[in-house]
From Swiss-Prot:
Protein's name according to its UniProt entry: Cytokine receptor-like factor 3
Occurrences of domain Fibronectin type-III (ranges): 181-274
PROSITE patterns, per database record: FN3
Keywords per UniProt: Acetylation, Coiled coil, Cytoplasm
Tissue/organ expression: Expressed in several embryonic and adult tissues, including adult and fetal brain, liver, spleen and pancreas. Expressed in adult, but not fetal kidney. Expressed in skin and squamous cell carcinoma (SCC) and in several other cancer types. Also detected in lesion actinic keratosis (AK).
Gene expressing this chain: CRLF3
Coiled coil: 10-57
Cellular compartments annotated: Cytoplasm
Annotated GO CC locations: cytoplasm; cytosol; nucleus; plasma membrane
Amino acid sequence: MRGAMELEPELLLQEARENVEAAQSYRRELGHRLEGLREARRQIKESASQTRDVLKQHFNDLKGTLGKLLDERLVTLLQEVDTIEQETIKPLDDCQKLIEHGVNTAEDLVREGEIAMLGGVGEENEKLWSFTKKASHIQLDSLPEVPLLVDVPCLSAQLDDSILNIVKDHIFKHGTVASRPPVQIEELIEKPGGIIVRWCKVDDDFTAQDYRLQFRKCTSNHFEDVYVGSETEFIVLHIDPNVDYQFRVCARGDGRQEWSPWSVPQIGHSTLVPHEWTAGFEGYSLSSRRNIALRNDSESSGVLYSRAPTYFCGQTLTFRVETVGQPDRRDSIGVCAEKQDGYDSLQRDQAVCISTNGAVFVNGKEMTNQLPAVTSGSTVTFDIEAVTLGTTSNNEGGHFKLRVTISSNNREVVFDWLLDQSCGSLYFGCSFFYPGWKVLVF
């Protein structure tokens, strides 16, 4: 009885500790949720503020542009009025000058005639004779024609008031406010030297024609375009390991020119070591990141291997052929358990590969199944999974079995690859006998 009573406080103490730990854990979780709420509130507040600024700026720009366009149109119309006025007034001015000249001539003639007549007949006959002679040379019955009012311009402005209704309708329909963008980033998948970005449409009423993906380092202020097209997935290459990047996507509606608002930016990074070719091999020139190999015109031959065994089972290894040269049946692109110098091709033991003609080799033996020939732009992928980790039967002739899937040009072959011993990671390599072949690995 006493032992039970002594034990009871210990149990109570233990239970109290557990309750305290549970309460601490609960408090931490609630703290995380509070932080999540703060982030959500911040996103709403900041996006609302940004949207207000965008709307104000846009409509101010619109008002300025419309005012400028209206002013320019007014100036054009006023210039047309000036031109018509000047062109049609000139004939009237000429006619007025002619009439005024006739009036002056007639007034002079009247004065001369009256003076001549004051002298009467006799000694003033000479003046009368001179006046009569002068008057006979002036066509007093010839009057210039003055145009009727119906025959001269009467300027007016034709202004269609319906434009106000048209503009009003467009203005009332101009712009929308959306509570969320029509597309969002769905998933970020790390790859060696890259990140696969997948996005999806979240607005069922929005019909997307194209998507636009941008990214930047989190330390940068500038996003840059990395993909524009109709696909909903893209691998962003040249990603530095263990560096945070920000991604965002938008869409363009069917038949529209403008892009939708950007999705909520997502942060991702890759912890995987980038795939690199071995530098310094005489027959190949490498890019600055050493993920692109170009077969140069050096006479040196052999297999160009990866710098390290960076391919692990369960991953997808991708080779993209950027340019092609003259094919040779000994060409090879593939993976191997270890580097072996002295070989001109991966068509050897402890390696699997595809030749540029599409032939598949496993441990140096050509398979019956064949893939399409490799061309410029072709993508060849290797997916390898461990099948057995223990010793297999002697009939299989190996100790470690891997299941390999090689895909190229929408075709694939699947087979088991037997190795002498287990290996946690694999090398990759390529060999080309003629220059011009360029291969990107990721």
